[in-house]
Amino acid sequence: PLETIIPVTSINMVRQLCCLLESMLPGEGEEEIRDAEVLESLFIFCVIWSFGGALVDDSMLKFDQFVKRLANWVVIDAPGRYAKAGQLPGTSPTLYEFEFNVKEGQWIPWSQKIQGYEIPMNTPFNQIIVPTIDTARNQFILDHVVLKCKQPIMFVGRSGTAKTATINNFLSSFDQDRFMTRTFNFSNCTTSMDVQLSLDDNFDYPTKDTATPQGGKEMVVFIDDVNMPTVDTYGTQQPIALLKLLIDRGGMYDRGGDLIWKSVQKVFYITAMAPPGGARAVLDPRFTSLFNIFHVVSPSDESLHHIFNTILGTHVKNFSDEIQHIFKTVTDATITFYNDVVAKLPPTPSKFHYLFNLRDLSRVFEGLCKST
């Protein structure tokens, strides 16, 4: 059986499929798609990111093979040649590496969206986002689910997979005249009252029982580490119960003595979290079922080399030729060392602190970027 990063119901996958199809099919007043093969290719692309969007790495490979076998289309694996509608691309291992472009009627590698990027000089290290295949497709998913469908979305992935950075980059691109954003960083001390009071600060009340974002704008709420709040005596995470009420019922009760119901309008939700374990609780399935859920995979070695070669290469641009000739070797050696540490030093009961992730690797390169 296929394994998902967190439990996902069948009906949730179908709802996610409908959301993606709705966001990619022509809207009212736009030209209809009349080519059956274009529609079928679009459907396959949406199936990959709905039924297969929350799968773990190994299951993604199995699901990809199943979809290809089920479609039984010609596979195009010639370098430099794109597969068209009615064909499947084979130049990369899986369909997860491709976007089906409806206008052009062909499968385009995500890698085509990340070429020619240069880091602006003097950018703080923690604000550098080097585009990769992963960030390109996550940005695409955010655009379609949040902006076009206006549905809640949840990114789940290990620490250091750039979930927060990708979402913050997405939020920073918004039209400030149309949208306002609010970010919550949940912890084990977060309470439902904290969340409600913070939201209240950003609302106008055109009537006593209706809340809308200030200035007539739409509001996108980003909740990071959503599974961190403490589970109470009754097995409930109170901030999660409040969010479930907001998303499912579209409102919340006033905390005053009258307990007036307030309808909350024009608010959309993005959440991110690492898989449950340690201080991270298992979320209520009734809460997660409200979201479009996507697994943010760990970057491949190829992506890691691209990221850190770009960062280090920018830093040593004005260094001597000797340094510029060896910086790629330094990147290769550091990534190899990191992979060896992860493989050979797993956490054990006596060494439970042996938890290494990509943030540790980033700290090494942050130190290298302080060299003069």
Predicted regions span which residues?
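Conserved RecA-like P-loop NTPase ATPase core
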Residues: 1, 142, 195, 199, ...
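A short helix-turn-beta junction within AAA+ P-loop NTPase domains corresponding to the substrate/partner-engaging
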Residues: 1, 172, 176-183, 265, ...
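AAA+ P-loop NTPase catalytic core
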Residues: 1-219, 312, 339-342, 366-372
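The conserved phosphate-sensing helix
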Residues: 41, 142, 332, 336, ...
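Conserved catalytic/switch belt of AAA+ P-loop NTPases
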Residues: 147, 196-207, 222-264, 268-270, ...
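Residues immediately C-terminal
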Residues: 161, 227-231, 278, 293
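An amphipathic alpha-helix signature
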Residues: 196, 284, 301-312, 331, ...
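A short helix-loop-helix "switch/interaction" segment in the helical subdomain of ASCE P-loop NTPases
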Residues: 226-228, 321-332, 343-356
